[in-house]
Amino acid sequence: MNENKGNFANKKMIKRAIKDSFIKLSPKTQMENPVMFLVYISSILTTILYAVSLVGIRDSKSSFILGITIILWLTVLFANFAEAIAEGRGKAQADSLRAAKKDVEAHKIPSIEKRDEITKVSSALLKKGDIVIVVAGEQVPADGEVIDGAASVDESAITGESAPVIRESGGDRSAVTGGTTVISDWLIIEVTSEAGESFLDKMISMVEGAARKKTPNEIALQILLISLTIIFLLVTVSLYSYSIFSANQAGVVNPISVTSLVALLVCLAPTTIGALLSSIGIAGMSRLNQANVLAMSGRAIEAAGDVDILMLDKTGTITLGNREACEFIPVNGVNENELADAAQLSSLADETPEGRSIVVLAKEKFGIRGRNIRESNMEFIPFTAKTRMSGVNYNNSEIRKGAAETVKDYVISRGGCYSKECDEVVARISNKGGTPLVVAKDNKVLGVVYLKDIIKQGVQEKFADLRKMGIKTIMITGDNPLTAAAIAAEAGVDDFLAEATPEGKLEMIRDFQIKGHLVAMTGDGTNDAPALAQADVAVAMNTGTQAAKEAGNMVDLDSSPTKLIDIVRIGKQLLMTRGSLTTFSIANDLAKYFAIIPALFIGLYPGLSALNIMNLHSAESAIFSAIIYNALIIVALIPLALKGVKYREVSAGKLLSRNLLVYGLGGIIVPFIAIKVIDVLITAIGIV
């Protein structure tokens, strides 16, 4: 997916784009862009005028008509090239994805219980609801949910990430994608998509642009451009009638030529943005694909640019995801060494990052070495969501660690006493944003292990930048309100939702939307699906469940919760690029007006020579210079349209002021200079 990341275009893309530029000259394709269709019709008209001029019927010199005709056709081809080069980047990505999509032999079984009754079928014949078994070394034949087994899966063909991932039944890591490869163990998979409707098929369709529809903003802008074009068309037609009348009144033989008026129309129409509008949208989706995010629609990318509420999961986005033991706090006169020893014993079989960190801290702080967990007199008690405790029975003693309330009930039920000192330590740790794990031995509380969430480096600066952009950040966590408040304050988020439930997230999103906000969020579990379906920008993790992917309007192939911030940047960059180039295109008209209008009417009204502020050589050179600039500026702006305007984390007001200065004022100054330079060059080499 990201093999071409950072490249504008390679030789293969450019060759294919040049070829596609000519293929796109068909009337059906040209009609999809009304502004450029006008240039296309104008090119055909001047071609006819040139052919007629060869037999002596002309209102301008044949060489002048030929020159205008060539430049108009080049303008159409340049617009086609801009769109083709943007599509080419998507096609290159689609080619690599298509290589991963091949027909393989699937091992179909009737059910989990009858896994030995294997029928070999083509993956293309699999239907939704079929059950297949895939063993190490085999390719997953279709999208599905793991209903039994656990295995390492190589998803590099889809995500570009070489490190294998774990896929297993149950939980939020059960979704598998057709085209990936099982590299260890085995999986039994229930197919969740029909042939031709797989995740890979959707990816290929999206990156190729086949499934791309114009967004509401694109449609609105295109309506504006069409309206301006119609106005300029009416003005141009009126000018022809007016020039005939003026020529008769002034006793001049020839009115303004049709070729000159066609050149005027093309120069005044918003051809620059008209030529680049489609490529800007395609390039925006391509940049998202290069970030390993699949957008289900262009509308989702635009919505990302308008988002003003970001709902971010604490784990993995704001914190590193693994809490670490940082301190042993004994109570009731217990020695810290005794607490550390008991905490380590209870964690020897605990494979969670938190459990391993307790073992490491005890070793580093007190030199306590891990013991052999296979000793016959050790019975480990695993953590469950119901008991909220784990521990070990060892040498006629019971050691438990877990949530404060759970351990409190455990100690009291055994006739022990839970001290106020322990409550105070628990409250103090919670107020600091940590997680307290209370450790007890038999009916006595030994103390508390302080687990600390490690805030990711640089997140404070990121949230400060988002605040400058007018975006409010909300941390979503299952922690209690005290812990959540402390972490939120340290990370610098604007608000938080503690003890979050699926219903709570959904309600919060609806409340913000009722107030007129656009909300973005990430999710990976089935319980996230309702909130994802409600959010304006919903990024589902690729490692998540099928329900989450179907509810979201984007899928992050890297399954990185922090990607949401990058998605917002890409969305804003897309909107900025479109707005900036629209401003530049319309501002260009002022300079072209001063180049062409005096040149057209100077024969009828010599006094208009005062408007020739660029001191252009002649009427013909003025028209040529303007029409050449009109074509070349499209080519010059293609890299900007594809890469996007550079985005800065500042307020919308400052961005608007800056872009008006750069692209508004620049759109006036640049053509004045460029048209004058072109005029000098074509005069010097004798074109006119």
From Swiss-Prot:
Assigned EC number: 7.2.2.6
Chain ranges passing through the membrane: 37-57, 65-85, 219-239, 262-282, 594-614, 622-642, 668-688
Location (main, coarse): membrane
InterPro entries xrefs: ATPase_P-typ_cyto_dom_N, ATPase_P-typ_P_site, ATPase_P-typ_TM_dom_sf, ATPase_P-typ_transduc_dom_A_sf, HAD-like_sf, HAD_sf, P-type_ATPase_bsu_IA, P_typ_ATPase
Alphabetical keyword list: ATP-binding, Cell membrane, Ion transport, Magnesium, Membrane, Metal-binding, Nucleotide-binding, Phosphoprotein, Potassium, Potassium transport, Translocase, Transmembrane, Transmembrane helix, Transport
SUPFAM superfamilies associated with the record: Calcium ATPase, transduction domain A (SSF81653), Calcium ATPase, transmembrane domain M (SSF81665), HAD-like (SSF56784)
Protein's recorded name: Potassium-transporting ATPase ATP-binding subunit
Organism of this sequence: Clostridium botulinum (strain Alaska E43 / Type E3)
